[in-house]
């Protein structure tokens, strides 16, 4: 509404847990919204205003994800009934590539990428680590799964195959 009132069209690309929640219905909650919003100067101003009005933390929209955006993105548009905002999310393939490369372990207060990886592996019916690498190659042609993460991803694939979790 705020963007529309100013005659602005914001392009919002939502990543991470919020994308999994909105587009793939895989989670019930996320603590923040990882997003790249253009134009960013207007978006930051409007996000501060929304945070103030809704009593949200100032960093409720986190644009740190922009450091990890692939040279070739795979995005899809979500239906959205607002003239001031266009929302896109990564495809499942692109999210899998991002999550597999990050492969962050759980920490106190942070659940990491394991549950999201498990969900994506199941959704996409991935059967091998090389299948995961093929998705990575589409978006990050110069990156490979770290050796220490390969065993974890193989274990998650096996869990999904056996129908666990």
PLM regions: where:
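Compositionally biased terminal segments of proteins
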Residues: 1-165
């Amino acid at each position: 509404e705020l963007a529309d009132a100013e005659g602005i069209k914001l392009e919002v690309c939502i990543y991470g847990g919020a994308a999994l929640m909105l587009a793939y219905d895989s989670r019930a909650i996320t603590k923040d919204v990882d997003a790249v919003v253009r134009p960013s100067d207007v978006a930051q101003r409007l996000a501060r205003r929304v945070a103030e009005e809704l009593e949200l933390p100032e960093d409720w929209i986190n644009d740190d994800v922009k450091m990890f955006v692939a040279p070739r993105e795979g995005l899809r548009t979500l239906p959205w009934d607002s003239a001031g905002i266009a929302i896109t999310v990564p495809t499942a393939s692109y999210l899998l590539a991002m999550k597999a490369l990050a492969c962050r372990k759980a920490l106190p207060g942070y659940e990491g990428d394991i549950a999201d990886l498990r969900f994506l592996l199941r959704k996409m019916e991935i059967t091998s680590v090389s299948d995961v690498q093929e998705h990575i190659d589409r978006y990050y042609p110069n990156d490979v799964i770290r050796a220490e993460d390969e065993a974890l991803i193989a274990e998650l694939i096996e869990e999904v195959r056996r129908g666990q979790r």
